[in-house]
Amino acid sequence: MSDKTKTNEGFSRRSFIGSAAVVTAGVAGLGAIDAASATQKTNRASTVKGGFDYDVVVVGGGFAGATAARECGLQGYRTLLLEARSRLGGRTFTSRFAGQEIEFGGAWVHWLQPHVWAEMQRYGLGVVEDPLTNLDKTLIMYNDGSVESISPDEFGKNIRIAFEKLCHDAWEVFPRPHEPMFTERARELDKSSVLDRIKTLGLSRLQQAQINSYMALYAGETTDKFGLPGVLKLFACGGWNYDAFMDTETHYRIQGGTIGLINAMLTDSGAEVRMSVPVTAVEQVNGGVKIKTDDDEIITAGVVVMTVPLNTYKHIGFTPALSKGKQRFIKEGQLSKGAKLYVHVKQNLGRVFAFADEQQPLNWVQTHDYSDELGTILSITIARKETIDVNDRDAVTREVQKMFPGVEVLGTAAYDWTADPFSLGAWAAYGVGQLSRLKDLQAAEGRILFAGAETSNGWHANIDGAVESGLRAGREVKQLLS
């Protein structure tokens, strides 16, 4: 292997691959579910045209990559999938903590998310429900650090008011949510931030703190940087209905974890899968593509499908240079700087939920599991990693005890997606002015195709968007290689 490295915030891309301490820093009692079972050693018989090593190379082993590889494999193309990490899943990550299956990344699915739901039906995968109904206790933490306990009914009534006011024109702006720029109004609103609209809504202190918390989570950033149309589009994808939308976002997870669906898709694909293989360069040559890995291996293919997160493009050399539109996206990046945290406390707190306003760290807190014997496992989503060191157990304990005084923290498990050099950010989120330029991000460039949740038309912040983009890439491969 070469000694060349590329760095992000002090982390070596090469050292990250072999360092579980970096991948799961700050984790107590964590055991990653074996993703290697999806690795294929054989490929469906095919005749590689043009003297290339493969018909198709897919870069990235998340849901977009697994979907694209499956589509290409089933079309008879000899397909190789390269994943930089030592695991599959991309920005999903099934693991275990305190005896429970957990998800560090994308998790929730729903029948209103058509692409991922169809895949679950295809492979016979059911759902498990999170305990987010019939809540026992709800809290809000304001930006000044004060905490207010509110009845679940009052809490729910106020977030509904705030959210419906925020998205009041979603039907008008996105009558066809899977065609994002169908209306001129969508393009016009792309000049506005979520904060611009929140300021006009006349919300109460509670409602403003609730919607700030929620929108900071979607952004993985402060709401002044978060483009308004992206939120309206997601709401439209959920049927322009608050109850339906909330059900898509917080209720159902894939039985057996996200890795179960990844494994099923890749097993079906017949693709060859290699992990711990970062790609450093992609060059279009002689009617095909030459891919260079970080140990200087050269792999050739008729087509390459890039499914890695947008924020990592800057670590890959493209020849010829990518279009100006893509270069602008690469320079801007996508917003989200979020992290995921699980906390095991000794006390049985029951079914709890809490928001914390955007300047506070623990923006979304909910019960993952609870019992008198177990205590409580809290699932916590952090909008901006800079608000807390998720690997500092003392800091985490202090914040949890502000919300739930007197609890004893038994363990924590964390994943900082921005510190992961193969993500450099969390879930997809568009800044002001980005959604209207989505076509630039989606467009194929010669023999290089682009997928990933950021490039999807519909549920861009969800697993469904990644699957959608992988299906599109599969169609585009067929058009190029037919």
UniProtKB/Swiss-Prot annotation:
Question: Does the keyword Signal feature in the UniProt annotation?
Answer: yes
GO molecular function term, any single one? oxidoreductase activity
- Matching PROSITE patterns, A to Z? TAT
One GO CC term of this entry? periplasmic space
The protein's annotated catalytic reaction(s) are: (S)-nicotine + 2 Fe(III)-[cytochrome c] = N-methylmyosmine + 2 Fe(II)-[cytochrome c] + 2 H(+)
Q: How is it used?
A: Could be used as a potential therapeutic for the degradation of the critically addictive component in tobacco, nicotine. May decrease nicotine's circulation through its destruction so that an effective concentration is not reached or maintained in the brain. NicA2 rapidly reduces blood and brain nicotine concentrations when administered to rats at single or multiple nicotine doses relevant to the nicotine intake of cigarette smokers.
Q: Which residues bind FAD?
A: 64, 83-85, 91, 108, 279, 453, 462-463
Kindly state the subunit structure of this protein: Monomer in solution. Homodimer in solution. Forms homodimers in the crystal.
Additional observations: Overexpression of the gene has a modest toxic effect on cell growth, suggesting that the reaction product pseudooxynicotine (PN) is toxic for the bacteria. Coexpression of Pnao, which converts PN to 3-succinoylsemialdehyde-pyridine (SAP), can rescue the growth of bacteria by alleviating the toxic effects of PN.
Output this protein's name.
Nicotine dehydrogenase
Gene label: nicA2
